UniProtKB/Swiss-Prot annotation:
Annotated organism of origin: Cyriopagopus hainanus
Protein name (record): Mu-theraphotoxin-Hhn2j 1
Lineage top rank: taxon: Eukaryota
Propeptide: 22-48
Tissue specificity field: Expressed by the venom gland.
Length: 83
């Protein structure tokens, strides 16, 4: 039962992709399709002024984003719990 439902869903997705591909004449079809599916332009890098969780940092320079702190031991940004 689960396998037949999975195959039916996969078939519908494949039908949607093939139908959309037949209408699209642009060469950038895969990028366009992915950006429409996820509704985010993931192919253009987004820069931010602070470093997030797990990014390397230098202790004492305050490079990490708000609610994060640079670990003296590991030298990467971690979540600051307020202690």
């Amino acid at each position: 039962m689960k396998a037949s439902m999975f195959l039916a869903l996969a078939g519908l997705v494949l039908l949607f992709v093939v139908g959309y591909a037949s209408e699209s004449e642009e060469k950038e079809f895969p990028i366009e399709l992915l950006s429409k599916i996820f509704a985010v332009d993931v192919f253009k890098g987004e820069e931010r002024g602070c470093k997030g969780f797990g990014d390397s940092c230098t202790p004492g320079k305050n490079e990490c984003c708000p609610n994060h702190a640079c670990s003296n031991k590991h030298k990467w940004c971690k979540v600051y719990l307020g202690k």
